[in-house]
Amino acid sequence: MIQIVKKNDEIVKYLQKDRRINLNALSYLAYNGDADVHIYDGNIENGVIVGSLRKNFFYLATHNRDFLDEFWESLPVGHKVFSGVPKSIADIMTADREPVWYSPCKVFVHNGVHIAEPNQDFAIERLTAADADEVNEFYTYKSDGSINRIRESIEKMDSACIRIDGRLATWCLVHMEDGSLGPLYTKAEFRGKGLAEAVAVNLMKQLAAKNMPIHVQIADDNAASLSLIKKLGGMDFSHDCAWFGLDKL
C-alpha cells in the first residue's frame, strides 16, 4: 500500500545515502516544501517517489517494481512526465510501458572544489520577466505550458544573461523544479565568443555563494553542452538518467 506524506528528516536522510543519484529529488524537496512523497508499505527502505500532480513532475527513487506499478495505477488519466530518472529505474518503469517521448541524459554534479574564473569581457545581468517570451521561443522543449515554468523560474530562481547592443544574446536559468542548471542558450549570431561559458560560470558562482548544489542534466545528443561542461570547472560526471513521458489511459 502506498502512503503519501510530506518532507521529513527520515526521507531526506534516506535520499542522502546516495546523494548524487538522488540530487534532483533532494533539490525538488528543497525548492518545493509542500511536494508529495510516496512511500510503500510504510517502509522508507522500499524507496520513495517525489512529485506533484499539479506540476506533473515525478522523481523516482526506487527499484521496487511493485511500488512503481502501484504508483502508476494510482495516477489519474493523462500525460505524466518523469524527470531525471536514473537509467536503471527508467528501464524498469518503461519495460512494459511505451514512452510517448524519451530523452537519455548525462548528469554532472559539481565537486565543490573549483569553478572556472568568469570572463570579465561581458556585462552579466539577471533575466527579467519581460524576457520570458523570448527565452521560451528558443526553448528546445517548448510546449503549451513551458512559458509559465520559464516565467516562474525567472521570477523565483537565479539567472544570468548577456545583452549586446540591447539585444538578449545568451542566457542561463535554474530550473524551478529541481534547482538544476538550464536552459542555456546562445543565439546563432553570437556564438563562438565564449558567451555561454560566461553566463554558466556566473550562475554557478551565484549558487555556490548560497551553498546550493550545482548540477545539470544534459541530453546525450547535445554535443555542444557536453563539450562546454568540461570548461566550467569541477563538474564531474555522475550517472546516466532519462526524462520521459508516459500516457496513462
Predicted regions located by residue number:
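Short amphipathic alpha-helix that is part of the acyltransferase structural core
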Residues: 1-23, 112-145
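Conserved donor-binding loop and adjoining core beta-sheet/short helix segment
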Residues: 12-75, 164, 169-183, 187-188
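Acyl-donor-binding surface of acyltransferase catalytic domains
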Residues: 46-120, 243-245
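Conserved acetyl-CoA-binding loop-helix of GNAT-fold acetyltransferases
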Residues: 66-74, 192-208, 226-227, 231
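Conserved GNAT acetyl-CoA-binding A-motif
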Residues: 76-86, 207-219
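Conserved active-site alpha-helix within GNAT-family acetyltransferase domains
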Residues: 87-99, 220-238
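A mid-sequence, solvent-exposed acidic-amphipathic segment
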Residues: 132-186
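Residue-level recognition of the GNAT/N-acetyltransferase active site
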Residues: 187, 191, 219
